[in-house]
A protein has these predicted regions:
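Secreted peptidase-domain scaffold signal
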Residues: 278-364
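Short, small-residue alpha-helix embedded
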Residues: 231-245
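Subtilisin-like serine protease catalytic core
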Residues: 1-65, 117, 152-155, 186-192, ...
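C-terminal edge strands of extracellular/lumenal beta-sandwich accessory domains
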Residues: 353-367, 410-481
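Substrate-binding/access-modulating region of protease and related hydrolase catalytic domains
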Residues: 52-153, 220-226, 230-232
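Structured lumen-facing ectodomains of secretory-pathway proteins
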Residues: 119-193, 208-209
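Extended, solvent-exposed segments with strong compositional bias
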Residues: 295-296, 304, 370-414
């Protein structure tokens, strides 16, 4: 499976244990940990030996500086980025906690992803000193459990950890944030981690037996390990499976779909407590790529891939809201939206690093007696995160975030209007001139089980003259053959 190897560490200082566990997690992680899926994607690897051994029980130890690591990363990208688009970077610099300003390595990774059109996955970092975090978290931790560099990279997908296994004596229970997993937010209060996945647990005596994740050692034996280093490749595997299924490869779309899956899976969790997003990010994506890429009949997922220019906006009037979700003059249903884009970045502005903002509104318009049309968005940003004042929106919301999440369960109904509309707006900081910005908007509308709202919406769009295409995947092509 290793198609290329670059060695920047002399053989006597090499330790392949960490990377072997990571690669085995990408390739066989579901099987090794009893996580059933019929999909068996197999991937090829470019193995970059860049970081020397740091464990004296294994052999001689050495270290590497940040600048040297940056030089290695760029050299590797020069050689491989045209064909290798997904990169796992399970590392963290413990003494560089993200305290509000961007780290040098985070900025560098953003540059690399823009320059070479690749997607990098970064671990959120581990708490490596006692006490570890309980759940709910103890207040005495302060900022000790904040993410560390380079987990603040805006372009990277940062991955935290939750427990797969638990016991009577475990520090946390299944699906709770692992006791070592560093939390957000990132710089400028951007949501970090982006997603979480299984990365292990510990007993109160700090034993991992039966609580860690299973992977392979350098001899092919099954062993247990813990850490966000091992939750990160699980997210990589899911992203790579989505990307692999795409007939037309699209990194931004794959990123949006991964995070949208996480958000829709975690909607109850994130509604329980607004602070949960600091630990879970947008949640945990589905194990199966087909679950992410396909819809059931009782829901419809629409993907919009477009550009918006400065000083203008995009609108889609007369959106066909499902008739089966309209009762007694009111709209019902469950709506989740994920907006993904790549804002202009400028490290000269510190906390105002992200220079452009895109917003989406999806809601009802009504024509007044004077003939004017009134429109109001009905699907808010995360609960209690959308404030009117700039400082609050930056601290508590997603105004300058490259990923935005909107969600509403319409249980009491919304008074019927003249129709539904989608509106996309873009603005920039200090009104600087910026080029058109690409974005991906994913909207899922869910109804009661057994109600075919998928056909209602798709037929409604076609009746209104909108061109719709199914997202073509390799699975569909295989089925046709």
């Amino acid at each position: 499976y290793v198609i290329a190897r670059e060695e920047y560490v002399s053989p006597k200082y090499q330790n392949h244990s960490h990377a072997t566990f990571i690669a085995s997690t990408i390739q066989f992680g579901n099987e090794l940990n009893g996580l059933g899926t019929t999909e068996k994607h197999r991937f090829s690897f470019v193995d970059v030996v860049a970081i020397p051994n740091g464990d004296s029980t294994v052999g001689p130890i050495d270290s590497i500086g940040e600048e040297e690591l940056m030089e290695i990363i760029e050299a590797v990208m020069e050689k491989y980025s045209a064909t290798t688009k997904i990169w796992n970077l399970s590392l963290g610099i413990e003494n560089k906690v993200c305290n509000g300003s961007m780290s040098d390595l985070g900025i560098f990774l953003d540059y690399i992803q823009d320059e070479y059109q690749v997607q990098i996955f970064v671990s959120s970092g581990n708490i490596n000193t006692l006490p570890l975090r309980e759940w709910p978290p103890q207040t005495s931790l302060g900022e000790r459990d904040r993410i560390v560099s380079p987990a603040d990279s805006v372009r990277a997908i940062t991955v935290g950890s939750v427990a797969l296994y638990d016991s009577e004596d475990s520090i946390v229970k299944t699906m709770q944030p692992s006791p070592f997993s560093c939390r957000g937010p990132g710089a400028n209060y951007i949501v970090k981690p982006d997603v979480v996945d299984y990365g292990g647990n510990l007993s109160r005596t700090l034993d991992i037996e039966g609580l860690g994740m299973k992977g392979l050692d350098i001899y092919g034996n099954v062993i247990e390990g813990n850490g966000t280093s091992y939750s990160t490749p699980r997210a990589v595997q899911k992203f790579a499976s989505i990307y692999d299924e795409m007939v037309e490869k699209d990194i931004l779309l794959a990123k949006a779909m991964l995070i949208h899956s996480a958000r829709m899976n975690s909607r109850d969790l994130l509604e329980q407590n607004q602070d949960n997003i600091k630990y879970y990010g947008f949640g945990m994506p589905s194990i199966s790529a087909q679950d992410i890429l396909q819809c059931s009949e009782d829901e419809v997922t629409l993907v919009f891939r477009q550009k918006v220019t400065q000083g203008s906006h995009l609108e889609m009037y007369d959106f066909p809201y499902p008739e089966s979700l309209i009762h007694n003059g009111k709209y019902f249903g469950e709506i989740g939206m994920t907006l993904a884009y790549s804002p202009i970045l400028d490290d000269r502005y510190g906390k105002e690093y992200c220079r452009t903002n895109i917003d989406v509104s999806f809601g009802i318009y009504r024509t007044g007696n004077n003939g004017n049309t009134n429109f109001s968005g009905c699907i808010p940003l995360e609960s209690t995160w959308d404030e009117k004042f700039e400082k609050s929106r930056v601290e508590n919301g997603f105004k300058w975030s490259p990923i935005k999440s909107y969600y509403r369960k319409i249980s009491k109904g919304i008074q019927i209007g003249d129709g539904w509309k989608i509106r996309i707006d873009m603005n920039s900081r200090n009104e600087i001139t910026v080029p058109a910005q690409e974005f991906v908007l994913i909207i899922t509308i869910k109804g009661p089980e057994g109600v075919d709202i998928y056909s209602e919406v798709i037929n409604g769009l076609r009746e209104r003259g909108y061109v719709t295409n199914n997202l073509e995947t390799r699975q569909q092509i295989r089925q046709r053959q």
